[in-house]
């Protein structure tokens, strides 16, 4: 295939600005699917993506377009996620392309994730075509949005394309702009194979499938390939493309994006960003890989049935293959049994993984309170990274604790600026900058990550009636007043309910958990003490009173000492029960208490 007729491009935008709908129209225009097969969000393959109206996994499709100049072009489209948790997917997609369609909702304007994604595209040396979507809405204001793009992003928006992806207006103009304005890929077909591994996933029938972009050379069935990071050798079984259906082809050459299967059994051999070359004719040096994405939010996941542990482990392995940023390791809890400590890119990422485990693998799960990574320095000088309360150690042995902070960019209409700033201040934030573009404020804050990952995104959406948008990136670790909150039931610590929290909020949280447990734990024949503690100091306590059996019911008249003797005997019996009895905490009580910790 002549690489001058290939165009590789990504669609980037803020969440809900119409990326996936635009992709649907491009596929429809190029006859990628017939009318019967077309459906909304055709590239969003997971049910959860369609239900939430979001893109989670970057998807690729090859379109064949007959342009007005009479030539046939092969367009490799990468649809990317818009939510901040999945920005790593965007980075990988951009590395496989030469250009980007920057989609902006013409009624909403530039939003925080728009800025973040377009800067990634600029860093990747992309040619960028601004596309103003939803022009059929009454609130659409294309001229205002063009000025906003030039003011905030600094690219020429005078020739922005005006489209309505929903109704199909302007789709032909988008396709013509792609072939005329975006560059074709560069490379040498006679050079040794050099391809970058863009993504992997597990297919029930094909095993591990690799999505790659060919930089130099060709790849074909039967060829022996090498993963340059670990020298693992495999023989290619199948070569194919997505149209968006899987289609087997003879080979992939320079500039093409497609998939291969090679009977790969080891997940560790498939590293995202790795360079693939030919065994007999290796390339000189590997391609620069992607920036490694590290988890920032951690929580423990336990099966509600002990016999489901192995099924959960296999399910996590399959999800990890499809999501390199997701990590897990075995964990044992006294209260919840065997499970896994899992790492995620954010709370939406956590919710999506948990929902996929429950839906796709039919697992019934309990998740503990999410947390972030703290850097703990002990008095002996040892520095440890801690994300599990169980590993926190004793308070008296700790010299210093640092917590991760982020730089948050919030775009909000000026009428909601006051409530958003109040929220940031309540979250221990530090204001860095405030600027305006028209009646939109661009607010920059430095915030503790632990305050952002839980409900911050939902809160700014709620306070601004849905108009505010958020993007953030890691900043640095700073000294902080952090404590481990332990929950004790009859003086026995419950590991599943422990959490790491800022000292300013620890008493309130401790009281809330104790009150919730008091309502949830059934009464016993003896008194139950529920306590919240920091180290050896009790900061909150609730008591569940015991059942009382009337041991004097059979007495009538007689000596009062007989009555006192029976009551004293009952008192001693309850004391003995309390010292040897384990409190039966219902599984539901853990789940409800964990919701408070969240």
From Swiss-Prot:
Pfam families tied to this protein: EFG_C, EFG_III, GTP_EFTU, GTP_EFTU_D2, LepA_C
Enzyme superclass (EC): hydrolase
Predominant subcellular localization, coarse grouping: membrane
Enzyme Commission code(s) on record: 3.6.5.n1
Bilayer topology annotation: Peripheral membrane protein
Keywords assigned: Cell inner membrane, Cell membrane, GTP-binding, Hydrolase, Membrane, Nucleotide-binding, Protein biosynthesis
Boundaries of every tr-type G domain copy: 4-186
InterPro entries hit by this protein: EF-4, EFG_II, EFG_III/V, EFG_V-like, EFTu-like_2, G_TR_CS, LepA_C_sf, LepA_CTD
Binding site residues for GTP: 16-21, 133-136
GO cellular component, one term: plasma membrane
Disulphide-bonded residues: none
Catalytic reaction equation(s): GTP + H2O = GDP + phosphate + H(+)
Domain of life assignment: Bacteria
One Gene Ontology term from the biological process aspect of the record: positive regulation of translation
Family of this protein: Belongs to the TRAFAC class translation factor GTPase superfamily. Classic translation factor GTPase family. LepA subfamily.
Function, as annotated: Required for accurate and efficient protein synthesis under certain stress conditions. May act as a fidelity factor of the translation reaction, by catalyzing a one-codon backward translocation of tRNAs on improperly translocated ribosomes. Back-translocation proceeds from a post-translocation (POST) complex to a pre-translocation (PRE) complex, thus giving elongation factor G a second chance to translocate the tRNAs correctly. Binds to ribosomes in a GTP-dependent manner.
Protein name: Elongation factor 4
Encoding gene (name): lepA
């Amino acid at each position: 295939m002549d690489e001058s007729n290939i165009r590789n491009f990504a669609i980037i935008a803020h969440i809900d600005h119409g990326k996936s709908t635009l992709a649907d129209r491009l596929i429809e225009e190029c006859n990628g699917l017939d009318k019967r097969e077309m459906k909304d969000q055709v590239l969003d393959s997971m049910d959860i993506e369609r239900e939430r109206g979001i893109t989670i996994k970057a998807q690729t499709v090859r379109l064949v377009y007959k342009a007005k100049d009479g030539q046939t072009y092969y367009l490799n489209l990468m649809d990317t996620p818009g939510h901040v948790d999945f920005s790593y997917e965007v980075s990988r997609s951009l590395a496989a392309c030469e250009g980007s369609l920057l989609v902006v909702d013409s009624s909403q304007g530039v939003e925080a994730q728009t800025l973040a994604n377009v800067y990634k595209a600029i860093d990747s040396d992309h040619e960028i075509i601004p596309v103003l979507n939803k022009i059929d809405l009454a609130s659409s204001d294309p001229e205002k949005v063009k000025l906003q793009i030039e003011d905030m992003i600094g690219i020429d928006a005078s020739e922005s394309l005006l489209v309505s992806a929903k109704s199909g207006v302007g789709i032909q103009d988008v396709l013509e702009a792609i072939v005329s304005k975006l560059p074709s890929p560069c490379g040498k077909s006679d050079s040794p194979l050099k391809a970058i591994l863009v993504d992997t996933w597990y297919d029930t029938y094909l095993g591990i499938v690799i999505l790659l972009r060919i930089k130099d050379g060709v790849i074909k069935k039967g060829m022996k390939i090498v993963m340059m990071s670990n020298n693992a050798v495999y023989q290619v079984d199948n070569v194919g493309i997505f149209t968006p259906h899987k289609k087997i082809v003879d080979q992939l050459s320079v500039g093409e994006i497609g998939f291969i299967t090679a009977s790969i059994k080891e997940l560790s051999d498939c590293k995202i960003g790795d360079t693939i070359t030919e065994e007999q004719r290796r390339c000189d040096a590997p391609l620069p890989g992607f920036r490694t994405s590290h988890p920032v939010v951690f929580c423990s996941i336990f099966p509600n049935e002990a016999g489901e542990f192995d099924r959960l482990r296999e399910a996590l392995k399959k999800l990890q293959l499809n999501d390199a940023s997701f990590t897990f390791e075995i964990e044992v809890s006294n209260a919840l049994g065997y499970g896994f400590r899992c790492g995620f890119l954010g709370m939406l990422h956590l919710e999506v993984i948990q929902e996929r485990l429950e839906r796709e693998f039919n697992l019934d799960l309990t998740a503990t309170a999410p947390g972030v990574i703290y850097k703990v320095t002990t008095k002996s000088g040892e520095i440890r990274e801690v994300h599990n309360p169980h590993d926190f150690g004793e308070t008296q042995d700790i010299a210093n604790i640092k917590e991760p902070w982020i730089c948050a960019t919030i775009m909000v209409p000026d009428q909601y600026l006051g409530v958003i700033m109040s929220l940031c201040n309540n979250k221990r934030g530090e204001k860095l900058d405030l600027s305006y573009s028209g009646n939109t404020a661009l607010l920059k804050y430095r915030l503790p990550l632990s305050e952002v990952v839980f409900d911050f995104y939902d809160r700014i959406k709620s306070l601004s009636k849905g108009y505010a948008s958020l993007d953030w990136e890691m900043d640095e670790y700073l000294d902080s007043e952090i404590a481990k909150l332990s929950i004790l039931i009859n003086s026995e610590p419950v590991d599943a309910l422990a959490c790491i929290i800022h000292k300013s909020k620890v008493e309130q949280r401790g009281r809330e958990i104790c009150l919730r447990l008091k309502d949830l734990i059934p009464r016993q024949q003896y008194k139950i003490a529920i306590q919240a503690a920091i180290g050896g100091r009790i900061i909150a306590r609730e008591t569940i009173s015991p059942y009382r059996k009337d041991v004097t019911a059979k007495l009538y008249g007689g000596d009062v000492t007989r009555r006192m003797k029976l009551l004293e005997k009952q008192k001693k019996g309850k004391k003995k029960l309390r010292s040897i009895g384990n409190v039966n905490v219902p599984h539901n009580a853990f789940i409800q208490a964990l919701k408070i910790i969240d």
